[in-house]
Amino acid sequence: SLPWQHASVTGGRWSGNDTPRVFELRGKTLGIVGLGSIGKKVARLAQAFGMTVTYYDIRRLSEDREDALGVRFRLLDEMFEAADVVTLHVPLNESTHHLINADRLARMQASSILVNTSRGPVVDETALTEALTARRLFAAGLDVFNDEPPAPDNALFALDNVVLTPHLAGPTYESHEARIRNGFDNVQRVARGEAPLWVIPELG
């Protein structure tokens, strides 16, 4: 909603009294695809906003661990049918390429939102564009694309129910410094004959 409202103000139109185009996170269900380190952090943040958190991962946690994190496992298709917001946090490989396809998008509620900050080809971009265009999906937030940078004529650019950013969801001043430190630490580990940490899955 922020980009829309910003454009409204700078365009000379005051839309403060319009019918709201947003919903609260409190009481909604979040579906996390990929409960790695990032997925777990997202779960904690979502719980702070009062969301119910479900997840799908190829390796299910123990029930004790699920209880500690406050999350519940769901099969992927079940999650897509029930979640108000689905967020993706998986690496790109043969099993995740187009994991989110036309069939799974069709399972989502028309009021739901898809967020992808993992890798572009995890989502069938053509199928997503069609779902958004037909309003079978309320909105999407994409930080990644099938081709980066996307072509100027990408059909997503013409839609008003999608927010697009140039693969920068992670970088901050602090994270940039941490990446430099981690890279230096990895070089030292390898020089000592130890296994590196923070290996990129696609390159591992």
State where each predicted segment sits.
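Short, glycine-/small-residue-rich phosphate/pyrophosphate-handling segment
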Residues: S1-S8, R136, L142
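C-terminal helix-to-coil terminal segments
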Residues: Q5-S8, S15-G16, R21, D147-G204
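Short, flexible hinge/linker loops that cap or flank conserved catalytic cores
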Residues: V22-R26, Q47, A106-R107, L156
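Glycine-rich NAD(P)-binding loop of Rossmann-like domains
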Residues: Q5-K41
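Residues at the starts of beta-strands that form the adenosine-phosphate
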Residues: A48-T52
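Gly/Ala-rich phosphate-binding loop of Rossmann-like dinucleotide-binding domains
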Residues: A43, Q47, L132-T133
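Rossmann-like adenosine-cofactor binding region
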Residues: I58-A155
